Amino acid sequence: HVYSSVPQIEVLRMADVFITHGGMNSISEALVYEVPMIVIPFMSDQPVNARQVETLGLGKRMDYKTLNSQSLKETVLSVFADEKIKANLANVQNWISNASGNKGGAEMIREYYREWRNAHDNDTNETT
């Protein structure tokens, strides 16, 4: 079936993978519902958002200029099976659900990134 529009939040509640252009609203909704993302940015803030999704281990980004059905299929299957992405999403969702007062979701994402970066830097240092 092809639809001109769908109730995105209702669909996200049932989705295993979310293919998105990478707008901040869509990413935020995917984080709330712990849905792994494939971000295919087109303009504006979308490329930066896509890079952050991938850097934080919340999904993968793809280039619409080189996208084809085979690469999309492979990426969907990869993201769907990636337990690390699912664990990262669960951590972010937990932080979001516990946000209160002065500590909003944006600060929690920054905190998650700092923790991820520290862990990643430690992993890199251990292998050298």
Which residues does each predicted region cover?
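C-terminal amphipathic helix plus adjacent low-complexity
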Residues: 69-128
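Short, hinge-like loop/turn segments at secondary-structure boundaries
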Residues: 38, 55-57, 80
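A donor-sugar binding/catalytic signature common to diverse glycosyltransferases
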Residues: 3-51
